[in-house]
Amino acid sequence: RYYKQRWYVVGVKVKSEERRVKNSSAEEDVRKLVRVLPFDRISFLKLICEKHPLSAKMKKFLTPENYYEDCFGIYRMEDVPVEKIRIRAFYPEYNYIEEVPLHESQQKVKESKDGMYREYTLTVRPSRDFLQELLWHGRNIIVLKPESLRQEMIGILKDMTKSYETGECLNGEE
């Protein structure tokens, strides 16, 4: 997968897979062993599919188009549910996201009469990568729905403001 000017390789951690496969045949266990690595950081790569065959279902799951379905960026966050998200992009930013969509599911659903904004829906897991992308657009894009994501963005922006005012770290990580 190509993301932010870097190629990534999707694979399975074999040594752990051998141990888990002996103890359990559940494909969900194997899914937890999937690793995504930046290609430019790999110093040695060995194809071992012949020694450690995966099921046809698992091979299909690991293709980039299936593995990254409904995902933004390189992380597939199983614990983050797929959501239908509605955003509003203001002029001239909407020209940019129409030329380079935020996600392949992006669809324009409304345009203001005065041409000042357009609204879009996306079906995606709202991962950290996705939130960072929305924040990168600053005040030019806002989340309308779901309300939980809108409130999360408001919380992030409030924490950012307070961090700038106080010089303290308020990222929620200890």
State where each predicted segment sits.
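Surface-exposed, charged, gly/pro-rich loop-and-adjacent secondary-structure segments at domain edges
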Residues: 10-129
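Residue-identity detector for glutamine
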Residues: 5, 106-107, 132, 151
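Generic C-terminus detector
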Residues: 122-174
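Well-ordered beta-strand positions
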Residues: 1-2, 110, 135
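Coil-to-beta-strand transition motifs
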Residues: 2-8
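Structural motif
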Residues: 6, 41-43, 140
